[in-house]
Amino acid sequence: MTIIQSSIRINASADKVWDIVSDLDNEPKFWKGTKEIKNISKEENKVTREITIAFKDSKCMQEVTLEPKRKIQAVFTKGIIEGTKTIELIPVENTTEVEVIWDIKLSGLMGMFTGMIKKHIKNGTDQALESIKQEVER
């Protein structure tokens, strides 16, 4: 498995940050690697969805669990990516640390491109966090 980590400090409460990051349908606005989302089902704090990612317009299935105002965990259940993407909110005084951890591997022949895709995911995550910060702090 490949671990990719990134974090950013946002000058806002965890509640305010949560309002942005928990809007799963708005994910492509911040996460450029996510091109399209199709929700399959939703029950309580769990969403099953199909996402289209930027890499060759590949489709992946995810089960996303929301722990309100604390954590979002997306488990890739089908597609070229296996593993998880976790977004955690950590209140620090009057600010919020947003930490993203990808724990993934690429399935099949895609494994050959792990290094290139890891760099792409890291850059995309950094860019997403910066965009989220700008949106929240507006």
Regions found by a protein language model. Give the residues of each.
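Hydrophobic ligand-binding cavity/cleft-lining segments
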Residues: 1-44
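Short, flexible segments with low predicted structural confidence
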Residues: 2, 60-61, 103-104
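Solvent-exposed residues in well-ordered beta-strands and their adjoining turns
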Residues: 9-13, 52-54, 65-67, 77, ...
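Short, contiguous strand/loop micro-motifs
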Residues: 12, 73, 115-116
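Short amphipathic alpha-helical segments
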Residues: 13-19, 121-124, 128
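Glycine-rich portal/gate segments that line the openings of hydrophobic small-molecule binding cavities
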Residues: 28, 38-84, 97, 127-138
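Residue-level signal for beta-strand positions within conserved beta-sheet cores that form or flank
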Residues: 33, 60, 94
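Beta-strand/loop substructures that line and gate deep hydrophobic ligand-binding cavities in soluble
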Residues: 77-123, 127, 134, 138
